Amino acid sequence: MKIVEVRHPLVQHKIGLLRDAALSTKGFRELVTELGTLLAYEATANLDTESHTQPGWAGPVTVQRIAGAKITLVPILRAGLGMLPGVLALIPAARVSVVGLQRDEETLQPVPYFERLTGRLEERDALILDPMLATGGTLMATIDMLKRAGARRIKGIFLVAAPEGLKALEAVHPDVEVYTAAIDDHLNDKGYILPGLGDAGDRIFGTRLE
């Protein structure tokens, strides 16, 4: 399985800022948007291109364009929505599919509650957006949904990932590519990533208990 931990200095700087427990909701949200753009840039680096001739200011000019790739972004509710604006800024023509799963805090298993996928997934590159890859359960359930709907080319974009989740994903979906700003140390006994970011959804939407 292809796993890319993006070591670009800007990515590492911003993920470090994101780990600050004192960071405001506004600051957290802005950094998530910026990291979404930077990570999507890396995740789309292997798209095929083709030559195209078009009118230029001094006559015909040959340029490179994406070779027929259609992209759907798949934010996992609700935290994945925080990454969506940054990725759409890079790929404004992308279709958006939405998946809602929540983790049962006792079993740590994902429970689906919403699914709205764009059509013709077999023709599209699907980019799953979620700040955290922890146990991998939510991600694998999302991939199962996408594959049942016909998706063949799937990538996951995460701010941080746990080794346990990566290992679980590789055992079930080795064809999926993963792009992340950081591979963290481990999961605690409650299934949370350490050192992690805290609850990314609460920090993005400002719903932390004070």
UniProtKB/Swiss-Prot annotation:
Catalytic activity field: UMP + diphosphate = 5-phospho-alpha-D-ribose 1-diphosphate + uracil
Gene Ontology terms, MF aspect: GTP binding; magnesium ion binding; uracil phosphoribosyltransferase activity
InterPro entries (UniProt xref): PRibTrfase_dom, PRTase-like, Upp_B, UPRTase/APRTase, Ura_phspho_trans
Enzyme class: transferase
One example of a Gene Ontology biological process annotation: UMP salvage
PANTHER family: ADENINE PHOSPHORIBOSYLTRANSFERASE (PTHR32315), URACIL PHOSPHORIBOSYLTRANSFERASE, CHLOROPLASTIC (PTHR32315:SF4)
Protein name, UniProt field: Uracil phosphoribosyltransferase
Source organism per UniProt: Xanthomonas euvesicatoria pv. vesicatoria (strain 85-10) (Xanthomonas campestris pv. vesicatoria)
Upper classification of the organism: Bacteria, Pseudomonadati, Pseudomonadota, Gammaproteobacteria, Lysobacterales
